A protein has these predicted regions:
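Glycine-rich phosphate/pyrophosphate-handling loop used in enzymes and phosphotransfer proteins
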Residues: 1-192
């Protein structure tokens, strides 16, 4: 488990600029964790999201950090990918985090799920099939912002499953910056 600042992430990155303040993750993307996440994502094991969220929120440091955010946004997937998979793995995680934060704080903290602002507009080659350099180019211009005014001056937590090169979350955050939020953080299950 770790929380990394954008400065710490820049040291090992191809991207010149990070459009988010911090990266929160619970696992290293290796071994059995890697297999579990891949099963969750690609092998119709959508039910696993609750277990992953329980691991995340049992960590006091992560729980306290998440409570500082106003809005939670999943990385969107294309309609084609949704049709193939039957679910958006990041949306399931985001919904569960939002519900559990509200429950655990007796509704004193509302981490509002926003699933209609960040839109994936293009089908692209899966990032997992590309090398680091190609991932950056593949993801550019894929997302658009809709109804961004509800994010203005808010703290946003973007949810994804895996952080490999950071290209996907960085592009999402670049687009979200158009709404002029106070802060954007990224939470993933695992970091490569």
């Amino acid at each position: 488990m770790d929380i990394l600042t954008k400065e710490e992430l820049k040291e090992n990155s191809l991207e010149k600029e990070k459009f988010f303040e911090e990266l929160i993750y619970i696992f290293k993307y290796e071994g059995q964790i890697r297999e579990l996440i891949l099963d969750y994502k690609f092998n119709e094991k959508s039910y696993m999201y609750k277990t992953f969220v329980n691991f995340l929120l049992k960590n006091k440091k992560i729980f306290e950090n998440i409570k500082k955010y106003d809005k939670i946004i999943p990385v969107p997937i294309s309609k084609k990918r949704y049709k193939e998979r039957g679910y958006n793995q990041s949306l399931l995680i985001a919904k569960e985090i939002s519900m559990q934060i509200s429950y655990e704080t007796n509704n004193n903290i509302k981490l509002e799920l926003v699933n209609n602002c960040l839109i994936k507009t293009k089908n692209i080659i899966e990032q997992s099939k590309l090398n680091k350099e190609d991932r950056q180019h593949n993801i550019q211009g894929v997302y658009t912002l809709k109804n961004g005014s509800i994010l203005t001056n808010k703290s946003i937590l973007l949810i994804d499953d895996i952080y490999t090169t950071g290209s996907t979350v960085n592009e999402c955050c670049r687009v979200l910056q158009q709404a002029k939020p106070n802060k954007i953080g990224v939470l993933v299950l695992a970091k490569d």
